[in-house]
Amino acid sequence: MDITPFLDKKSKTPLYEQLYTFFKQEISHARITKGTRLPSKRRLSSLLDVSTATIERAYEQLTAEGYVKSKPKIGWFAAEVEPGFPTAPDHFQQSVQPGLHQKNAPAIDFHQGSVDPTLFPFNAWRKSIVKSLDRYSGSFHTSGDPQGEYELRHMIARFVRLSRGVNCEPGQIIIGAGTTVLLQNLCLSLKPGTKIGFEEPGFHRSRRMFEANHMDVTPICSDAEGVLPDELYRQNPYLMYTTPSHQFPIGTIMTITRRQELLAWAAETNSFIIEDDYDGEFRYSGHPIPSLQGLDPNGRVIYLGTFSKSLLPSLRLSFMIVPPELMEPIQNNVQLMKQTVSAHSQLALADFIETGEWQKHINRMRSLYRKKHAVLLEAIRSELGNTVEILGKNSGLHILLRLLFPASEEEAIQAAADHGVTLYPVSPSYIEQTPFTSVLIGYGGLSEEDIRLGIQKLKTAWAPLISSY
């Protein structure tokens, strides 16, 4: 599976030393297990946007100290570290409404929640299903662990640590049939009227879940760097919901400075942050920024993740990582609600991850979605030119298209529908008035050919709107 260290390029500590320290701690604490293959110099250099010399220097030091073994012409592998081996101290441990469209289903649907159905490795998934049936058949007569099957929670704890820098134990993880189910569980542990800060704009389904549970939802404004800390101190919510890795719907990536400011606010005010990392696997430019949870030394972040984008939306499997302070009340609700995902699906997914099939699938998806992403941007620039502005183009499976001609959201979506293209509105994501007209364009479920054709159709559909102003 992918291993993504975080390097602070503003630090006085040399980059090779930061990289060396990261791998040393991960191997020492068995979070990277014996025999795990480390990323190649070229891959890690590209991922972190540093020179291969930096990677090589770190790997050579790790090899010299016995943390890594080098196999010529093959790569570097984690070595076994003897108990008592000196180590550094560990870190703290403890769908959008459719737009207006015509009655007949349109040929091209730019839904932001769709994935490419041709990419899913059904044969590998079938093997994991059969294996889980054979291995755990004796346990399927019960409803399973209310918190989720331990085997899956163990694998999730491992991969989020390596890929997103998340610090957690399997006991902090709760499995649920979608993010909204997990938020419902969270709401049951809160008093009605609890003040929830919600990024403005934000994912309206999550907001409506809070509202349905009688929470006091308060919009918190953002800028290009993310949620505004001054607004948080002024509004003083108990919980703050945010999507820092790919802000929904605008698509900005919260800066490391702003992440640190949010964590400082939470620590100072004894508040909590809900980090919804809904498609953190897909990033197309820039060096990786670790999750808020991974940067947090104080246990103030509730982390939400999902397999809807990385596997299949129909699997309906998400997870919530809860800080120790909140575990008891949330666990009580888990016992009340029971588990909403079948034990069979959970155990099959655990095997799918353990055998490396999930990481192979992610790698393939990243490669193909990167190509689709490039095709989409090129088609927009070629066909729509300076009539639109592309927002949120560095990660995720959707972009925001800001209209630079004065048509309304409704007019733009209806014109597209009249030409066989479905677009999605942004206005439901705002609590207050939208500052500009824009539409959501998802591309994960479309072929490159359909992406090009869809944008060509948009050019034709919007031509009368553009020329009339």
From Swiss-Prot:
Position of the signal peptide: none
Gene3D superfamilies xrefs: Type I PLP-dependent aspartate aminotransferase-like (Major domain), Winged helix-like DNA-binding domain superfamily/Winged helix DNA-binding domain
InterPro entries from the UniProt entry: Aminotransferase_I/II_large, HTH_trans_reg/aminotransferase, PyrdxlP-dep_Trfase, PyrdxlP-dep_Trfase_major, Tscrpt_reg_HTH_GntR, WH-like_DNA-bd_sf, WH_DNA-bd_sf
SMART domains xrefs: HTH_GNTR
A GO biological process held by the record: biosynthetic process
Residues where N6-(pyridoxal phosphate)lysine is found: K309
Listed CDD domains: AAT_like, WHTH_GntR
Needed cofactors: pyridoxal 5'-phosphate
UniProt keyword annotations, A-Z: Aminotransferase, DNA-binding, Pyridoxal phosphate, Transcription, Transcription regulation, Transferase
Domain of life: Bacteria
Domain HTH gntR-type: 13-81
DNA-binding region: 41-60
Pfam families: Aminotran_1_2, GntR
Gene Ontology terms, MF aspect: DNA binding; DNA-binding transcription factor activity; pyridoxal phosphate binding; transaminase activity
Stated family: In the C-terminal section; belongs to the class-I pyridoxal-phosphate-dependent aminotransferase family.
Protein name (database record): Uncharacterized HTH-type transcriptional regulator YhdI
Organism: Bacillus subtilis (strain 168)
